[in-house]
Design a protein with these regions (language model features):
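Active-site phosphate/ATP/adenylate-binding loop shared across adenylate-forming ligases
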Residues: 1-168
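Conserved small/polar residues in nucleotide/adenosyl-binding loops
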Residues: 170-172
Length: 172
């Protein structure tokens, strides 16, 4: 969804993606804010780690994400690894409006996530074009309007931030 607000006289639109720890606090925010996230917080209830991250990227890569928030930068690296490994599957799911049936996702969660999925052949074609052009599409390619990346930058988390260098327009 979109989050619209006034900021110094300008209208701002944001799409949010949150990591797993951030997902816990995200569940407690008011409903009028929740509706503007890239996906339902029920995704964090998926017990299978690989299925959870697949779902996070599947639901996010389809959208024009402008803000990514996660406590631990390892989440960003994991999202990118998933995008590389499953890119073609994401494109297929987006084109068909599906969520990979091979994933170990409890049925009640799958039903909740799939209820809003619709075939999106236009976005699937855009993603295919990105893969043809860049071979390995990066966040700066599929989320060109990503403006904010909020994460920890202390201690050993710097190791993960270094892995993200060059994958976004700027790294600070």
């Amino acid at each position: 969804g979109d989050y619209r607000r006034q900021s110094r006289g300008r209208s701002c639109i944001r799409r949010y993606v949150f990591g797993s720890v951030s997902g816990l606090t995200r569940k407690d925010v008011p409903g009028f804010i929740k509706k503007h996230y890239a996906f339902s917080s029920i995704v964090y209830d998926i017990p299978d780690y690989n299925a959870r991250y697949y779902a996070i990227m599947r639901l996010s890569i389809e959208q024009d994400v402008t803000m990514l928030v996660t406590a631990n930068p390892s989440t960003i690296v994991e999202m990118q690894h998933n995008a590389i490994e499953y890119f073609d599957k994401y494109v297929e799911d987006i084109e068909n409006g599906t969520l990979n049936k091979d994933l170990n996702i409890p049925e009640y969660i799958r039903e909740e996530l799939e209820k809003d999925l619709k075939p999106n052949p236009k976005r699937a074609a855009e993603l295919r074009r990105l893969k043809e052009e860049y071979y390995t599409p990066l966040p700066r390619h599929y989320w060109p309007n990503l403006q904010v990346l909020s994460t920890w930058k202390c201690g050993n988390t710097k190791v993960y931030l270094d892995k993200f260098k060059g994958r976004s327009e700027e790294h600070t």
